[in-house]
Amino acid sequence: MATKSTFKNFLGDLPLTAEIDWKLRTSRRPRKDHFNLDKLQKALPAARAVVEPIAKHAKPGKNVLFFATLHYWIEQSAFLGLALAGLGHKVTLLTLPYAEWHKEKDKFTQRQRVLHTRDALATLSPLVEHTSMLDLKPGAVLTERNLADIKEISLWDVQYTLMREEVDMNDPADRALYDLRIERNTFAAKAAFEYLQSKKPDVVLIPNGLILEMGIVFRVARYLNIDAVTYEFNDQREQIWLAQNSSIMKQDTDYIVEARCKLPVTDEMFERVADLENARRGARVWGKSKRLWQYVSSQGAQETRHMLGLDDRPVVMLAANVLGDSLTLGRDIFAASMTEWITKTVQYFAKRNDVQMVIRVHPGEKLVPQAKSMGTVVREALPELPSHIHVIGALDKINTYDLIEIADVGLAYTTTVGLETAMNGRPVISCGQTHYRGRGITLDPNSWDEYYATLEKVLSDIPAHQLNEKQTEFAWNYAYRFFFEYPRPFPWRLMNFWDDLEAWPLEKVLSAEGLAQFKDTFDFLVNEPFTWK
């Protein structure tokens, strides 16, 4: 295998070898490569035919640079680019045709991926211009800030890939992955730096905007003071998360708090939040999602207490996130990592047998078995678990919402369980940079000293730290805005994109019916100010 890869690297260094082979042989064969845009290539001619007459009558819009990498993002971005072109925007799609972000591929195969992407997207022209980042030959000199961004994002890339926070630079595999991410992110930064300066777009549109080259392009755009919009998807069909001039993975909700949380919560809003919470409590899917947030339905507070062997001492619940989830990266405040926070927290509570501690490992760990479990972190911190500390694994038949009900105090890093515990009127100590922190409904230490002092103060008089009626009402208000107004209507998620496209073809999306639902979102994607109906 190594000999074959070496030979392909040799061929890849020879001028025109990949191009000649592609033209005479490979382009006519069925693709066996994981990077496969054949389905997209077949679908685009009909899609362009739909958009072309609409675009001719559209009012000229913005100059949009759209960055996408990995074949699944490229598939979706091609159709989103066409939709924006149909609304009058001048769209350039800048692609980075990698199949994997964590593996090196021989130069010959990589050059042919560039050719495959070029052919697949050729039909977009002239509605959408396409450029491959790998065709650029950047020579930009990066600043210290750019280099610092590259190092930070490359470390996050490794944590995201390995699904653990500890990266051992003395371990050959960890180091090789980190070096690969440094190399690729450095190239992307230089290419983006020169390309953005030459294109001078009004706005850069980027998926995710936190990790991999997506994070790099976002950072470079902001460094150059170019507006950037980032987006991701939740579990609901026909919804999108959007952020303007911040990474969507940071979940900055300041703007929605300012604009919406001063408005009262109606009975209908309250009931809608309660319906969502009851679905999770009952281990039911909700709305247009197929995801179960809990795998066992509520068994009630008393039964849960009995199952865990809890007595009358106060209960402190620590709700964990999944390690390596990009929603947790870069969220540290006083702890170096969530692992360190959990380690020191359980060691503190090991000496506090005046209370009982329940650690809820995130049920989502079931979906990523390769991730280091928070249960493992606890066992490493406390090889002999005291009887007053209980670890509930991802697959254990305990419902998180029963734990919220029996908890007297909540501890959270970034999980939404912290918000939901506050909605129950319980004091919550927020220890990571999460969207509901600093809203007046959590206790927010900024150092280890403050954290331990807050624990001592709360545990000495738990009733005095219960949320008052006004705080609890705000928690429900905020929950409504976050769950129902923060997501925006959008036709095509990344997952199940082709199924969504069947339900919402371009002609339907750009019809009066489609625009009534999605036009505002398309406007927000090109950095028009957020509004609410």
Model-derived segments and their meaning:
Residues 2-63, 83-186, 233-295, 496-500, ...:
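Conserved N-terminal ligand/cofactor-binding loop architecture of enzyme catalytic domains
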Residues 4-34, 38-41, 305, 312, ...:
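Long, C-terminal catalytic modules of enzymes
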Residues 188-243:
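Conserved nucleotide-sugar donor-interacting segment of glycosyltransferase catalytic cores
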Residues 71-93, 97, 218, 337-350:
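Histidine-anchored nucleotide/phosphate-binding helix
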Residues 282-380:
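Conserved catalytic-core segment of nucleotide-activated headgroup transferases in glycan assembly
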Residues 67-77, 206, 327-328:
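A short, glycine/small-residue-rich beta-strand->loop->alpha-helix junction that serves as a flexible
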Residues 54-57, 182-198, 309, 332-333, ...:
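Donor nucleotide-activated moiety binding/catalytic core segment of transferases
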Residues 202, 213, 239, 396-443:
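A donor-sugar binding/catalytic signature common to diverse glycosyltransferases
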